[in-house]
């Protein structure tokens, strides 16, 4: 039992374990809230960087940040049943109905831009082109092998048929990114900041305000904006239809976006990360999990025309009230292109 391991390593007696956001085991003491977070995927260097980021944000008086607790032996992590975990401490969560996700994220990024230390292992700034290129090359090589080795499962057939379309979209995203870096100049607000691996609807909400360092990377702020918008459009369509780009408006009331930021954001929306993640996850998953990814692929393939319209609408919105065309249009989007 993890209770016994934590008693041994930290001297903390756990009365009851529960779950935080269906993701992390957690427990409370009279004055504090603790999260038990798996960290086997991180190198020691990356964990150290995440530790210093959390300490920095705590020093900046971020009320929601969780911080690493050292074991009695002075270690940042502990082992349990062959896996590595960290114990994070936060203020007890409470609901905040006045919470504005856009404004709150802008303030979080503002603080993160002041982070004074170099970030290497957890750094992603300036790396999108290379990371996307590697992802494309790997899936393209896999796709070619699949084409040449029938018979195919239904998922294989859908992947084989759809990949050329998403390859084209991916190449457009990389070209858009390259053109942005050539044509535009970053401003002060375009410097690196503390971001999230995936900023989604449930990452922060009025009911879940805790900032979790294991979720973080150091990158350009547009990463979080794009991923939040993508996730909302794909998985919370009703909210998106009602609120539109309110999230982006709230963000810009705190930190207006430069043309460079807007173009980076748009290039990231263009890159079909959701397609790559579903296909990669399917082939890495157990048999019991495959049905979920089959359904997800069907959903995004049936939805690709609406996603193109979303991209066009996002481009138009980011150019509103601008004196010049900040975010160039991708001419073929929304022209009835097929998979």
UniProtKB/Swiss-Prot annotation:
GO CC, alphabetical: endospore-forming forespore; membrane
Record carries keyword Membrane: yes
One GO-annotated biological process of the protein: sporulation resulting in formation of a cellular spore
Bilayer topology term: Peripheral membrane protein
Keyword annotations: Membrane, Sporulation
Compartments, record wording: Forespore outer membrane; Spore coat
Primary localisation category: membrane
SS bonds (residue pairs): none
Keyword Membrane: yes
Protein's job: Involved in sporulation.
Family as reported in the entry's similarity comment: Belongs to the CotS family.
Protein name, as recorded: Endospore coat-associated protein YutH
Gene name of this polypeptide: yutH
């Amino acid at each position: 039992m993890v209770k016994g391991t934590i008693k041994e390593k930290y001297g903390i007696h756990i009365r009851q374990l529960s779950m935080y956001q269906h993701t992390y085991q957690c427990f409370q003491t009279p004055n504090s809230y603790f999260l038990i977070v798996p960290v086997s995927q991180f190198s020691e260097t990356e964990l150290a960087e995440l530790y210093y980021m959390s300490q920095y944000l705590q020093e900046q008086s971020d009320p929601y940040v969780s911080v690493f607790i050292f074991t009695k032996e002075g270690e940042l992590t502990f082992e349990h049943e062959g896996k590595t975990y960290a114990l994070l401490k936060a203020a007890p969560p409470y609901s905040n109905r006045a919470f504005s996700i856009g404004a709150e994220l802008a303030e979080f990024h503002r603080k993160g831009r002041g982070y004074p230390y170099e970030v290497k292992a957890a750094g992603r700034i300036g790396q999108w082109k290379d990371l996307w290129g590697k992802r494309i090359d790997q899936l393209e090589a896999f796709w070619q092998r699949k084409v040449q080795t029938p018979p195919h499962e239904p998922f294989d057939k859908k992947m084989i048929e759809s990949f050329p379309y998403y390859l084209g979209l991916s190449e457009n995203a990389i070209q858009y990114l390259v053109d942005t870096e050539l044509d535009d100049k970053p401003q002060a607000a375009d410097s690196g900041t503390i971001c999230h691996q995936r900023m989604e609807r449930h990452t922060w909400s009025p009911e879940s305000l805790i900032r979790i360092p294991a979720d973080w990377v150091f990158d350009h702020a547009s990463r979080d904006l794009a991923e939040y918008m993508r996730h909302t459009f794909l998985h919370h369509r009703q909210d998106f239809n009602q609120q539109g780009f309110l999230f982006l408006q709230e963000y810009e009331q705190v930190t207006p976006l430069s043309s460079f930021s807007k173009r980076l954001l748009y290039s990231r929306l263009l890159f079909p990360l959701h397609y790559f993640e579903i296909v990669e996850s399917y082939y890495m998953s157990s048999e019991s999990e495959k049905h979920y990814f089959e359904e997800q692929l069907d959903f995004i393939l049936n939805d690709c025309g609406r996603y193109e319209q979303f991209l066009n609408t996002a481009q138009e919105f980011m150019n509103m009230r601008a004196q010049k065309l900040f975010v160039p249009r991708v001419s073929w989007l929304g022209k009835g292109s097929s998979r």
